[in-house]
Amino acid sequence: CSSDLNRIITLGDIDEENANDIIQFIHEINYLDAEKTESKREPITIIVNSYGGDIYRGFGVVDAIKDSVTPIHTVCYGAALSMGFIIMASGHKRSASKHSTFMYHEILWSLNDEKLSSHKREVEEGKRIMDIYDSIILECTNLTKKQLDIVKKEHRDWYMSAEDALVYGIIDEIC
């Protein structure tokens, strides 16, 4: 689970600053690697120890990972919960320490104190975001829509060990 120290960045809880730093870092490394063939590029390592955070900013990190020509390895040390789970699963190569914990749940979405008509739009947006969230998981892992729907129906958090994450295709190896 090691890499070139100049290509390692840490992801904690996802907020504006942290997400923007990671997106910028990925783009800078891709710019520096532009003359190299894909096979000659040293990977970027994102160390994940995150309880989650801002979903929109997290989607920005996921898109930067997916768009990166330079390979991105995500490594979990500690926790990959909520949006941290999605980012962790989005890596091109994914590994975790043996005591890492992963967690999936329905997104947390609050309604603003506005008029009733505004609430309908907020609920529609929440559903749209939940669909994106789940589609990323279904694309990057072996989890099924049925498994995700059960968790949402039961309104619970689904915690998984590193061994579980390996079985479900959330990670590729335990290091």
Regions found by a protein language model. Name each.
Residues 1-175:
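Terminal-region recognition feature
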